[in-house]
Amino acid sequence: MANGKFYQTDFVSRGGKVSSSEHGAWMWNKLFDQDFDQTLTDANLKPCEGNKAVLIATSSGWTNYRHQADILAYYQELKKNGFTDDDLILIMADDLAYDSKNPYPGQIIRNNKSLENLYSDVKIDYKLDQISPLDLKNILLGKSNEKLSVVLDSDDSDNVLLLWSGHGAPGTLLWDENQKTITGDFMSDLFNEMYAAGKYRKLFGIIEACYAGSVAAKCKGVPNLLLMTAANDKETSKAELYAPLWNTYLSNSFTMAMLETLQGENYYDLSIRDLYSDTFSKTMGSHVTLYNMESFGNVFFNYVFEYFCKF
C-alpha cells in the first residue's frame, strides 16, 4: 500500500514461482524510481588510463550458493571484456564446486538451462576464511604483507569496480559465517582512505545484500564514489531461480537483472543511469538504489564501459 492505494507486484516466491501482474509491478516501481540531477558535473579528473575490479562473495555454504555463483558470473563477464587475472582480485569461500550436494561436481552453474560452468579457469586470490575485514581494507589500500601478497594495484588514473554479494542487516554487511560485520562507517572510512591514497580515479561499487542501502548511505560525500545497491536501507534483497536439482537458489533477483542488462546492451552506449533504470525495472521484491551521485558526477554521462570493459 502506498499513497492510500494498494499495488500488487510480481514477486519471485521462495518456491521459485512468479505471481501477480506485470502492470502492478510497474505501478509500484514507478512510485520509487529515483530522479537524477542532469546538471551535475564531474570533477576535473585526469584521463582514465586503466581499470581494475575487486569481486567479493561474503557468504559460504550450500544454501548461500547464489552469492558465489553471481560473483563468478561477473568474473566471467569481465574476462570476456578483456580483463586478465592481473586486473582482478577475487575473494570467495570456494566451498561449492566439490560439495557433496553438487549435482555437477567440479562445476558451479548459475543457469540451469545453458549449464555454463562458471568455475572454469577461475583464479581465486583469497578464500573467505583466510582474511578478515581488516585484511580487506589493506587489500583495497594496496598494503601488501606476508599474508596479503595480492593487493589492489591502482592509482588515481584508474577506474575501480567493486562487486559485492552476500548477506546484510540494518547498518551492516555480514562477513563470513562467523557473522563479523562491516558497518557503514567502516566502508565510508575505507573509501575516504582509498581516495586520499590515490587508489582510484572513480570507484563504482555494486552491492547485492539485504539492507545494503543502509551501508551505502553512510558513504555520502566520498569523492568520486558511486554505489548501487540491490535494496534500500529498509528492505531485504531477494533470491531468485530456485533449482530443484540443486535444492537451492542459483542467483539473486538484482544480479539476474543486472547481468541481463549488461549482456543485452552495447556497453559503450549504456550510461550508468540507463543501467540503473533497466536493472530497477527488472528487479522484483526490492528497490535498486544509487547513492552519492552528488560527489560522483552526472550518471547520464558516465558510461558502463568505463568500469566493465578493459582499457
Q: What is the role of each PLM region?
A:
Residues 1-311:
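Cysteine endopeptidase catalytic domains of the caspase/legumain-like
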